[in-house]
Amino acid sequence: MNILKISLAVLTIGSILSADSIDDKFQSLVGKSLFIGNSSNLHSGHYEYGKEGGNQPELSDSGITIPYYFGDKGDLWRPFVMGGIGYSKMEEENSNLRDTGDDIELTSLYYKIGGGLTYNPTCDFSFVVGGSALVMNTDGDYTTKTPLTTSEGDQKIKKLFDSETTNSIYDGYGGFVYKPTIYGYKSELKSNLHYLKMNFDNGIDDVDGIYLDVMAKVRSNELTTIFCQPVWIEHYVKGDFVNSKLADVIGFNSAVSVGSTLHWRVGPLIPIIKDSRLRDLNVALNVQKTISNRDFEGWKAGVGFSLVKF
């Protein structure tokens, strides 16, 4: 009888620990997707978490955020709004949730809205405050060689990883932008301090924290012209620094990204926008590599559009 009581107690403790680990896994995988989708430095890339050959989640993200500034460039105060949409896929093979080598796939579509205010005391220096909200709708697919049972742990796995969930991240930030010309080269220094809060579905604990992003960029002079429009290149270094509370969810304390963007001005070639605010539209080719202090690394490469005046 005593042996039976002890066995039942062990099973009860085991199920509680399993439920906690399932919550942590959901918080970690979805939290990574939320952070990357929200990050101006890291979104639209492919990233790996963990060592080769081990439990190694992989995330692919693709999105676009478009800001709109009211007023004119020389105005002292300029409010702005932004809107964006994106898609991400988080995959983890041979998950350690169960001992059966199961696979997790979380496919998400997200929407982002926000706005803020810039203060421009000089032509090359600005302060900014703003905020945004990103809502992510996630469709989970849990693949297992051993069917899920009616146990509490397995049913929680089904609820979180084999169903649809809605999660979100809220971002309040303030920072500055400085655009000096150094030895004839246009440069840019930028930094923002963020307060982030992640909200998770199904009663999973929220996570909040502070993080700092920085960027240093230098622009070349005109390299050549195509159809009489300038082509130039930018080289940059970006950094993301996260407090420990947030780092445990997103998988790193500090990350550094190095990249280049090739721009070709096309706005004047398009009749319907050549005399509008979109006249500075460029086709942009970007390549970036990211490393971190933990087992987080990634890259991104793609063709898009930019609104940068040459």
Write out the residue ranges for each language-model feature:
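Small side chains
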Residues: A9-G14, G115-G116, G175, T224
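Short glycine/proline- and aromatic-enriched beta-strand/turn motifs that initiate or cap beta-hairpins
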Residues: A19-D99
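Outer-membrane pore/translocation modules
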Residues: K25, D72, L76-V218, V237-N243, ...
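Residue-level detector of the transmembrane beta-barrel scaffold of outer-membrane proteins
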Residues: L29-G37, L76-G84, S126-G130, K186-K190, ...
